[in-house]
Design a protein with these regions (language model features):
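Flexible active-site lid/hinge loop adjacent to a nucleotide/diphosphate
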Residues: 143-244, 304, 309-324
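Short functional linear segments
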Residues: 1-61, 68-79, 85-86, 126-147
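Hydrophobic alpha-helical packing residues
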Residues: 72-77, 164, 478, 506, ...
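Active-site-proximal loop/hinge segments that shape catalytic or ion-binding/gating pockets
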Residues: 553
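Long intrinsically disordered, low-complexity regions that are acidic and Ser/Thr-rich
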Residues: 243-316
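C-terminal helical cap/extension that packs against the catalytic core
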Residues: 233-237, 241-243, 310-331, 368, ...
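Nucleotide phosphate-binding/pyrophosphate-handling subdomain across enzymes
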Residues: 171-174, 183-186, 190-194, 199, ...
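N-terminal phosphate/diphosphate-binding loop that engages ATP/GTP or pyrophosphate donors
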Residues: 71-123
Length: 568
């Protein structure tokens, strides 16, 4: 039965979609979320604490958290465990947020569970009302005016935790929605907490400095539960090669005086050489070109980087560059937080020889770093008995156990690793990749991965951003790293940055940073109707060594992949 023919599923979906959904908001009232955690925690307690029926891994981070969650899910499934995976946003269908053993939740089971929880919510509200006479509340969960209503994300979490208990999963992987401190997922006691990375995103809510952002994310750490910190190589890489001062020292002598232009010399791409991008053998992991000692020093956290051609320049904005000192400071902050909670602490400083031996593709250096984070979690849960005091039936020896995983399971997961809208190749003729990269750091990470896997390709970026995101930073990265940039907008989505605004941001940025560099300006074009552009692009003969990369948000990635799959 199609989901559109399942009235119970449609009713449950309508109920969820009518809840307050901060994912659709341009500005999120972060300071009001603390009160929300109490009602979620109380409701889960009323339900019998379904989250205590399985091991939980809780993953936060500015970027990389979705990939780490996906890696853990695929590793544990390869090892034979039953796994629940809660992530956001969904790409095509709502049930993708609630995955059990690698598949979206069955729609009928989802609908039945949601209906049951609605009735339990009514009972919970009636009991709460009896105990809190005089407090304004409504029993009807369908009434949007109810001030004490749980939000879309809160309901989604409760549904997920209940589904996982019903499915008797061995382990649940929970991805933080935003931040950590006031995220609904933080009501759960996690057996392992993970901080994948820290960079600039959601600054309005989390703070305008890396330390403030890190503290909000580290608030997920629980007493006696290990913390794995992945802040390091990946963050430093994403933010740039090194701090702004070193960039200036390495700047080309021909850069305009006073402009933030930083050229890194290398061999140019041979535009005449065409490469068959459909041949996966051309997805390479070649060693980098040798560089001078000073430049090698500047790249000490950028191992394996493919050099850019001479006309590539890095448009640096010092306040958004993550330095080596930043990385060390955030690591120490994570260490202190773990110490305060009596939590064992593990920091990822380099990729192990085992993870380094995993296949490429599908693992580029960025994914490899995230796989390293995942394997640290796997190692902890393979040797540590999870907290027995929090589980029902704690006297039962089967209520607490380890999760041993063989290396063969990790290797098998790596060999077939893939995730929707995360460096997802949706077409090979023409070659089109979609990625949900939606901040400066994730754009830089994507471009690094693309250059590693397709070193001789011409990379054309199609960019549509959301209001409130760092469009300037994303454009700056693409100006530095892509061969061509096409600015567009999601015309049917009020959250999309209007194309005229993107054009203005682009013009202002280039005027301020590279006014005399015509090659940068020639990279940029506009596509007022990205749907028409995509249909036309798919219909034309393949560009040989050209790759079209749709970037800027998961919502844009979702739309592009649907159009491409219908067209190609």
């Amino acid at each position: 039965m199609k989901s559109s023919d399942n009235p119970l599923y449609q009713r449950a979906k309508r109920f969820l979609m009518r809840r307050t959904n901060y994912e659709t908001f341009v500005s999120v009232p972060y300071d009001k979320m603390e009160a929300s955690l109490a009602r979620v925690r109380d409701f889960l307690e009323f339900l019998g604490a379904p989250q205590n029926a399985y091991i939980i891994v809780h993953v936060a981070g500015t970027k990389g958290k979705g990939t780490v969650c996906g890696a853990l899910d695929q590793i544990y499934r390869a090892a034979g465990y039953r796994v629940g995976l809660f992530t956001s946003p969904h790409i095509d269908d709502l049930t993708e947020r609630f995955q059990i053993n690698g598949a979206p939740c069955d729609k009928t089971i989802f609908a039945e569970t949601t209906s049951l929880l609605i009735e339990r919510w009514k009972a919970f509200r009636r009991e709460w009302k009896r105990e809190n006479v005089g407090v304004k509340t409504l029993d009807d969960p369908y009434d949007d005016a109810a001030e004490l209503q749980m939000t879309f994300f809160e309901w989604s979490l409760v549904i997920a935790l209940t589904l996982f208990a019903r499915a008797q999963v061995d382990v649940a992987i929970l991805e933080v929605g935003m931040g950590g401190r006031y995220d609904a997922t933080n009501v759960c006691y996690a057996d392992v907490s993970v901080l994948t990375s820290v960079s600039y995103d959601h600054c309005e809510q989390l703070g305008d400095s890396l330390d403030k952002i890190a503290r909000e994310k580290l608030a997920i750490v629980k007493s006696n539960a290990p913390l794995v910190c992945g802040v390091g190589f990946a963050d430093f890489l994403y933010g740039g090669l090194d701090d702004f001062k070193r960039r200036e020292e390495l700047a080309s002598a021909t850069s305009p005086k006073g402009a933030s232009l930083h050229a890194l010399s290398s061999e140019p791409i041979d535009d005449e050489e065409e490469v068959d991008l459909n041949d996966e053998a051309n997805e390479t992991s070649e060693s980098p070109t040798p560089v001078s000692a000073p430049e090698r020093e500047a790249r000490k956290f950028d191992e394996g980087r493919r050099d850019r051609p001479e006309d590539y320049v890095y448009i640096a904005e010092p306040e958004h560059i993550i330095t080596h000192d930043d990385v060390l400071r955030i690591r120490e902050l994570a260490r202190e937080t773990a110490r305060e909670h009596n939590a064992p602490f593990d920091v990822v400083e380099k990729v192990s020889s085992f993870v380094a031996s995993l296949p490429q593709p599908p693992l580029d250096s960025v994914r490899r770093w995230n796989f390293e984070i995942a394997t640290r979690v796997v190692d902890i849960l393979a040797h540590r008995v999870v907290a027995p005091e929090r589980r029902p039936g704690a006297n039962d020896p089967d209520a607490t156990r380890r999760l041993p995983v063989a290396e063969e399971a990790v290797r098998a997961a790596a060999e077939r690793f893939s995730m929707p809208a995360r460096f997802e190749i949706v077409s090979r003729d023409p070659m089109i990749i979609v990625d949900g990269a939606h901040n400066r750091a994730s754009i830089a990470a994507f471009m690094r991965a693309a250059r590693e896997r397709f070193p001789k390709a011409k990379i054309k970026a199609l960019l549509a951003t959301s209001i409130g995101k760092d469009a300037r930073g994303m454009i700056a990265e693409l100006a530095a790293r892509a061969d061509e940039v096409i600015l567009t907008e999601r015309t049917r989505d009020a959250r999309s940055t209007p194309l005229p605004d993107l054009i203005q941001i682009h013009e202002t940025l280039l005027d301020e940073t590279c006014a005399e560099n015509a090659s940068i300006r020639r990279k940029f074009h506009v596509a007022p109707d990205f749907r028409a552009f995509l249909i036309g692009y798919c219909a034309r003969p393949s560009g040989g060594n050209e790759i079209l990369c749709a970037l800027g948000s998961f919502y844009f990635a979702s739309e592009v992949r649907k159009i491409v799959k219908k067209t190609v």
